[in-house]
């Protein structure tokens, strides 16, 4: 019996597409799905005429694979992954490799790696970005685990990943759960990107008064620039011309303004808090989705609470350009926060992440792919120990040149009652990061006053506590 090179468990659309991608690149595939009907449908249509072998039990599936077996699990994160692993364990042999390609919590990946190690089974936690289209035609892959396991899988990964000017969009991330952690932060950055674009759209539509055709033109032009050329700007431009065939109204205007989320943005915020890394733009993006979801409450509030009534009286063309500058400055800050989180996680968990390589593999295939990532890669290649992207000469100069427009846009939004939480959070991050003295000296004095938490001084070494109450009483 001829054995297959690679196996995929889970035939939802991502599993189907990545299986077809692997087969198209010359690796015979075996597939298994819990539901036989799903497997039958896949084999009858999309896999017809391909070198794909269907299995209808895990025993049959495992027996159809050459050793060491390479099995990609594409099922829902959490307990379903654990269930598949438990079912596979008695069927596999030492040296076989299980790859989790879902959006698993990185600590689950660490736990599974440790649990499988005594059995001799190898485990790879791999972030996969690019959605359905990327899975089929070339995603960005973020595999974490042992280096030897990655090297064994790299001939396949290098073929199926998106291809850019400097190679395939895959690299060895690091040990344990690092691959899933990097994918989580990628998704957090994606949240920030999408919220910043939404705020730019809101300003252009409701301050500048642009219609759908004009919005399409502006975003299309922005997508031709070095700084904003990206997949998300491209699809944003493509959304505006689509007219609902029934109402003849731009479809975007008919979509309910309540954004969903699957949890990776929230995870990013949670881990940042645990590691003590400020990511206010990404946090604002998560909060914006939460606020959008209480739509009925917002609609009721809009009839009770009033805001400014003023209209924008400035030059529309100049305002559009200022919004572009504000969007780019905010984007730099959002990515600076994401990279700072990766840097801290790398040090905390001893992952030795190469941040320049992270930027490189995000250049193609993934949702945040953008020309701007070349600049990030260059910054970290020139200085791998760079503490923050805001300190990179190019980004520093860009913000210095454009900060007046950035500030003007946020002031205008505030005057007109247009919420721009991610724009504002980005500017606050920039202003806080560049200050040599923040007002937290008062915060520390307050903590010492009510809780004797002590404080340090700028003029002498040591830790100090003051009996504030007697001093205050004496002043009365």
Q: Where in the sequence are the language-model features?
A:
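Small-residue-rich helix-loop
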Residues: 222, 347-380
């Amino acid at each position: 019996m001829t054995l297959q090179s690679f196996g995929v468990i889970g035939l939802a659309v991502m599993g189907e597409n990545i299986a077809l991608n692997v087969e198209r690149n010359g690796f015979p595939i075996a597939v298994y799905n819990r539901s036989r009907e799903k497997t039958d449908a896949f084999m009858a249509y999309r896999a017809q005429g391909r070198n794909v072998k269907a299995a209808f039990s895990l025993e049959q599936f495992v027996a159809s694979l050459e050793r060491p077996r390479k099995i990609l699990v594409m099922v829902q994160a959490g307990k379903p992954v654990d269930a598949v692993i438990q079912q596979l364990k008695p069927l596999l042999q030492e040296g076989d490799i299980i790859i989790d390609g879902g959006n698993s919590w990185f600590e689950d990946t660490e736990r599974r790696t440790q649990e499988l190690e005594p059995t001799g089974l190898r485990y790879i936690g791999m972030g996969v970005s690019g959605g359905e289209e990327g899975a089929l035609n070339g995603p960005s892959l973020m595999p974490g685990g042992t280096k030897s396991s990655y090297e064994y899988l790299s001939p396949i990964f290098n073929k199926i990943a998106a291809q850019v000017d400097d190679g395939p969009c895959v690299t060895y991330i690091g040990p344990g759960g690092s691959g899933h952690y990097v994918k989580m932060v990628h998704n957090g950055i994606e949240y920030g990107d999408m919220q910043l674009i939404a705020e730019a759209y809101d300003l252009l539509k409701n301050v500048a008064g642009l219609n759908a055709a004009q919005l399409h033109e502006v975003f299309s032009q922005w997508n031709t620039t070095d700084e904003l050329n990206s997949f998300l700007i491209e699809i944003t431009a493509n959304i505006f011309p689509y007219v609902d065939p029934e109402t003849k109204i731009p479809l975007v205007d008919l979509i309910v303004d309540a954004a969903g989320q699957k949890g990776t943005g929230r995870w990013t915020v949670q881990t940042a808090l645990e590691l003590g890394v400020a990511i206010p733009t990404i946090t604002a993006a998560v909060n914006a989705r939460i606020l959008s979801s209480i739509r009925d409450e917002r609609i009721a509030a809009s009839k009770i609470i009033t805001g400014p009534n003023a209209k924008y009286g400035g030059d529309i063309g100049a305002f559009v350009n200022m919004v572009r500058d504000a969007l780019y400055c905010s984007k730099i800050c959002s990515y600076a926060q994401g990279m700072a989180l990766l840097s801290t996680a790398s040090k905390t968990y001893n992952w030795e992440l190469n941040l320049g390589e992270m930027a490189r593999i995000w250049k193609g295939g993934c949702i945040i792919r953008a020309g701007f990532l070349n600049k990030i890669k260059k910054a970290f290649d020139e200085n791998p120990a760079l503490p923050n992207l805001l300190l990179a000469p190019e980004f520093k100069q860009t913000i210095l040149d454009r900060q007046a427009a950035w500030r003007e846009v946020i002031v205008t939004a505030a005057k007109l009652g247009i919420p721009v939480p991610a724009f504002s959070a980005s500017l606050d991050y920039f202003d806080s990061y560049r200050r040599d003295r923040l007002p937290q000296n008062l915060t520390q004095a307050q903590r010492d006053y009510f809780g004797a938490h002590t404080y340090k001084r700028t003029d002498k070494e040591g830790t100090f506590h003051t009996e504030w109450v007697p001093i205050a009483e004496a002043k009365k």
